[in-house]
């Protein structure tokens, strides 16, 4: 029997745009769970599912769906921009994103992406 854990998880706390931010990434067999919070809670839970497009199978389109929280257009755009690279680098696996952040600016998004990259489990 192997000693490799069934669930792999990494976390990092860093100040992003002046706000203490916690990021936790957990790899399951079919999904990657990414939690990004500046409030100490999960906030909005968004599912990002890759779906193949006939023209380019190597870069599937990510379909977003809010599972919990406010379903606003900005959260779909923010979620795709924040974790699309996670799905691609993980072999087009689905991503569950739990996000509760104050700053949804492009600068904040780029900084959050780098913290997520540090927590790579895929």
Swiss-Prot record:
GO CC annotations on file: cytosol; protein-containing complex
Domain of life: Eukaryota
GO biological process terms on file: chaperone-mediated protein complex assembly; proteasome assembly
Location of N-acetylmethionine modifications: 1
UniProt-recorded Gene Ontology molecular function terms: molecular adaptor activity; protein-containing complex binding
Keywords for the protein's UniProt record, in alphabetical order: Acetylation, Chaperone
InterPro entries assigned: Proteasome_assmbl_chp_3 (IPR018788), Psm_Assembly_Chaperone (IPR053720)
Subunit structure: Homodimer. Interacts with PSMG4. Interacts directly with alpha and beta subunits of the 20S proteasome but dissociates before the formation of half-proteasomes, probably upon recruitment of POMP.
Reported function: Chaperone protein which promotes assembly of the 20S proteasome. May cooperate with PSMG1-PSMG2 heterodimers to orchestrate the correct assembly of proteasomes.
Family to which this protein belongs: Belongs to the PSMG3 family.
Protein's name according to its UniProt entry: Proteasome assembly chaperone 3
Organism, scientific name: Homo sapiens
Recorded name of the encoding gene: PSMG3
């Amino acid at each position: 029997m192997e000693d490799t854990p069934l669930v792999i998880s990494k976390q990092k706390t860093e100040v992003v745009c002046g706000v203490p931010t916690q990021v936790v990434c957990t790899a399951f067999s079919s999904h990657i769970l990414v939690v990004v919070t500046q409030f100490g809670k999960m906030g909005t839970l968004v599912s990002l599912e890759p779906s193949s497009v006939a023209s380019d199978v190597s870069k599937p389109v990510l379909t977003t769906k809010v599972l919990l929280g406010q379903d606003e257009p900005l959260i779909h755009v923010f979620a795709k921009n924040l974790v699309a690279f996670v799905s691609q680098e993980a072999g087009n696996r689905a991503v569950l994103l739990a996000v509760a952040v104050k700053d949804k600016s492009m600068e904040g998004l780029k900084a959050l992406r780098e913290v997520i990259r540090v927590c790579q489990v895929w």
